Curated annotation (Swiss-Prot):
Keywords: ATP-binding, Ligase, Metal-binding, Nucleotide-binding, Queuosine biosynthesis, Zinc. Catalyzes the ATP-dependent conversion of 7-carboxy-7-deazaguanine (CDG) to 7-cyano-7-deazaguanine (preQ(0)). It comes from the Bacteria. ATP binds at H10, S11, G12, G13, M14, D15, S16, T17, T18, C19, L20. One of its GO terms (biological process) is queuosine biosynthetic process. Pfam families: QueC. The keyword Ligase applies. GO terms for molecular function: ATP binding; ligase activity, forming carbon-nitrogen bonds; zinc ion binding. The lineage of its organism: Bacteria, Pseudomonadati, Pseudomonadota, Alphaproteobacteria, Hyphomicrobiales. Pathway: Purine metabolism; 7-cyano-7-deazaguanine biosynthesis. The keyword Lipid metabolism does not apply. This is 7-cyano-7-deazaguanine synthase 2. Its cofactor is Zn(2+). CDD domains: QueC-like (cd01995).
Length: 210
């Protein structure tokens, strides 16, 4: 496999961290890109930074903010419930903005690829996590920046348990990444709530490995 310069859009969650470590394991020249968009989950940025430090991967961060509507975080939904509706936690425009910024940054540093942890075999029902969205975005980028970095989604058609299995082979453990929408402070430590959709999906993914 030819060595490439790969920029990974990296939140600190399981999917994007798996992409990051897989690209590194394949021998590519890898860098991590985080987007600080005024999110409530600064803990995810801390996890991403810690992962990059642990694996000696350069970390880039873009700071951007825009007006966001208040969102309700649903609790204790089953995986089956998540499959049949768009979560109230969906943030319109987020992936559209992230991929545009990521692609521009990838072009700026001379990367061959922008890798993303997009996963359409998911239960969130997010319209910007579908094969149609991904294919359409790739088409737009090819028109708007022909010859630019390729947008690659290595996990696109993998299930959550399959991603967890791959993550495990790369050395990741269940608590090495952060996905929770509602971090809690317990006994002076930041912990996942265990009730939001992200926590339930994370639990589902890793339980399947037992």
């Amino acid at each position: 496999m030819a060595r490439k310069k790969v920029l990974v859009l990296h939140s600190g969650g399981m999917d994007s961290t798996t992409c990051l470590l897989q690209a590194k394991a394949e021998g590519h020249d890898v860098a991590s890109l985080g987007i600080d968009y005024g999110q409530r989950l600064l803990v995810e940025m801390m996890f991403a930074e810690g992962q990059c430090e642990k694996y000696s991967i350069p970390r880039h961060v873009i700071n951007v903010n825009w007006q966001k509507a208040e969102r309700q975080i649903p609790l204790n939904r089953s995986v089956e419930e998540m499959a049949h509706s768009v979560s109230p936690a969906f943030l319109p425009g987020r992936n559209i903005v992230f991929l545009g910024l990521g692609h521009a940054h990838a072009a700026g540093i001379g990367a061959d690829e922008l890798q993303i942890g997009l996963n359409c075999v998911d239960f969130s029902g997010y319209p910007d996590c579908t094969t149609q969205f991904y294919d359409s975005y790739c088409t737009m980028l090819n028109i708007g920046n022909p010859g630019g970095p390729k947008l690659v989604a290595p996990l696109l058609k993998m299930s959550k348990p399959e991603i967890a299995r791959l993550a495990s082979t790369l050395g990741l453990q269940r608590n090495d990444t952060w996905s929770c929408y509602r971090p809690q402070i317990r006994e002076g430590s930041i912990v996942a709530c265990g009730e939001c959709d992200a926590c339930k999906l994370h639990e589902f993914a890793w339980q399947e490995l037992k």
